[in-house]
Amino acid sequence: MERKIIVSVSGASGAVYAKVLFDKLLHIKQQVAKVGVVLSDNAKEVWKYELGNELYKDYPFDFYDKNDFMAPFASGSAKYDTMIICPCSMGTLGRIAGGISNDLTTRAADVILKERRKLILVARDTPYNLMSMNNMITVMEAGAMNCQVTQR
């Protein structure tokens, strides 16, 4: 079964995790019909700072502006299977937990949750404060999965 996947890269540090995810998606391209990507302005800056390049532009994915509410996955009728926010900043997590759909990332996350599809949040900002942990609980209760990563 070919999947349709949304990847959002927020402005949290950890651009290397987004790059690894992009590379893995290329590796399994025969199993993926579409990959739609949203990068926040901060994500673009962090990528350039941490990785020293802007090579995210070279990946053969469909890129969308952070404010493009006409992107297909801004609606449940597009039937994207999975959304991965990698890395997921605590600000993005908080907006999703609060139901605030103020950009394409948070709108798509809202759609994925209401359609009972898979939302994976790759939290990066550790240690967590109490508000962030409560936001994680809220999104998990709504059906999302939280995945913490650390560098080796």
Model-found features: residue ranges?
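A cross-family phosphate/adenosyl-ligand binding-site feature
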Residues: 1-120, 126-152
